């Protein structure tokens, strides 16, 4: 069940069920001739909460999200990466380094959608509520307002209150609830707009 597609590396990256794939057309017939499983083991607790919404960041990283009932255990060259419940993923494709943030639903109970602005700042959306989040502050590890010393401990502390993942809480709201986020802008706009 495909829930995200992003062009890159001479083909397309695909969020497909419990896997992240790379598909490539090598003979020009517009069909994938090569399929590579980059990672598998993403949570499959509910079909509308699988890994989704993949996007490139300006540094080449791939960003994607997962929903509330996903309990992911992904084997990478850097070890097993665990991420429970709604969360945001970052993959550095050249190194195959996979990192998870906001486990335990710290920033919305059903993350769906990632967008990056002209300055490389990452934002994500929660499909279970009208809130959107500035992702970067919540990625800072090594302590939290609850006194936790790790992201995992912090996720347990924040389970009952996802808006507290970072002191700024939700950055914006959309009405009605949506499952996507996009940043509208262009370098061609005058600065005063």
Describe the predicted segments one by one.
Residues 1-193:
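Beta-propeller blade termini and top-face loops
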């Amino acid at each position: 069940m495909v829930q995200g597609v992003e062009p890159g590396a001479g083909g397309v990256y695909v969020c497909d069920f419990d896997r992240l794939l790379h598909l490539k057309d090598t003979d020009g017939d517009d069909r994938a001739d090569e399929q590579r499983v980059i990672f598998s083991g993403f949570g499959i607790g509910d079909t509308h909460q699988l890994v989704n919404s993949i996007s490139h960041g300006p540094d080449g990283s791939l960003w994607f999200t997962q929903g509330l009932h996903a309990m992911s255990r992904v084997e990478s060259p850097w070890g097993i990466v665990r991420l429970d419940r709604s969360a945001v993923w970052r993959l550095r494709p050249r190194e195959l380094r996979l990192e998870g943030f906001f486990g335990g639903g710290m920033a919305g109970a059903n993350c769906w959608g990632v967008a990056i602005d002209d300055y490389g700042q990452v934002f994500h959306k929660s499909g279970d509520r009208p809130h959107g989040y500035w992702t970067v502050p919540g990625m800072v590890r090594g302590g939290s307002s609850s006194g936790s010393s790790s992201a995992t401990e912090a996720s347990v502390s924040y389970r009952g209150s996802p808006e507290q993942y970072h002191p700024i809480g939700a950055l914006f709201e959309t009405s009605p609830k949506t499952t996507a986020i996009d940043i509208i802008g262009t370098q061609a706009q005058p600065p005063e707009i």
